Swiss-Prot record:
Keywords: Cell membrane, Cobalamin biosynthesis, Magnesium, Membrane, Transferase, Transmembrane, Transmembrane helix. Pathway: Cofactor biosynthesis; adenosylcobalamin biosynthesis; adenosylcobalamin from cob(II)yrinate a,c-diamide: step 7/7. HAMAP family: CobS. Its main location: membrane. It comes from Alkaliphilus oremlandii (strain OhILAs) (Clostridium oremlandii (strain OhILAs)). Joins adenosylcobinamide-GDP and alpha-ribazole to generate adenosylcobalamin (Ado-cobalamin). Also synthesizes adenosylcobalamin 5'-phosphate from adenosylcobinamide-GDP and alpha-ribazole 5'-phosphate. One of its GO terms (cellular component) is plasma membrane. This is Adenosylcobinamide-GDP ribazoletransferase. GO terms for molecular function: adenosylcobinamide-GDP ribazoletransferase activity; cobalamin 5'-phosphate synthase activity.
Amino acid sequence: MKSLLLMMTFFTRIPVTYPYDYDEKDFIKGVKFLPVIGLLIGILMYLPTLLAPYIHRPIIIVSIWALYFLITGGLHIDGLADTFDGIFSYRSKEEMLRIMKDSRIGAFGVLGILWLLILNLTLAYYTENMLLLLVPVVGRASAVFAASRTIYARSEGMGGAFIESCRTKEGVISIAFSLLLGSMVSIKGAIIPMGITFLGVAMLTKKISKILGGMTGDTIGATIEISQTLFMLSAYLLKSIII
C-alpha cells in the first residue's frame, strides 16, 4: 500500500496523503503498480461517459481529456513537448539534453502538443467507452516497458530512479496486467491494438535511446502520451478497416 500511495503522489494530482518518509525501496517496489494507477485514472476518465444519454458525445470527449489533464497535471504532455523540442533540434546529444531541460517551450513542442490533442480528441470520439478506460493503463504499462529496455541518459535527475527501477520483470508484469484487462474487454478490439502499441513502444525506445544514449523522464512522459494515441489509432483502424 505504501508503494501504491507513493506512485500516486508521483504520477497523479489526486489528493492523497502519504504519511511516510520517502524510501527508495518503496519507489522501486512501486513501479510495477504504475499500470494500476493507469486503471484508476481510466476509471475516473470513464465517468463522463455515464452522461451519454444526456450530453452530446463531443462534449463528453472534451470532458474526458480535460479530466485527464487535471488528474495528471499535464506532467507527461510536458515531457512530450520537451522531447520534441530536443530531438527535432537535430543538435548533438548533449545539446538535445540541455534543450529538453529548458523550462521554455519551443515551436516543435507546441506543434507536438497540438497534434497530440487533435489526434486524441478525434480518435477518442470513435473509440468505444470501455477501450477509453484502458488508454491510461496502456500508457503507463508502456512507460514501464520502455524503461525496462533502456538506461538513463543523464548523469542525474528524477527520471533516473524510475528508469533504473524498471527491469525485465517489471516490464513483463506491466504488459501482462494490461493484456489481462484487455482480454476482459475485447480480444480483437483491445488485445491486438495493445500488441501493436507495445511493438511501437519498443521501436520508439530503441530509436530515442540511439539518439540520446538512453531515455529520460521527459522521453518516458512522451512515450506515455504517444502510446495512448497509438493504442486508440490501432483500435480505430482495426475496427474500421480490418475487423
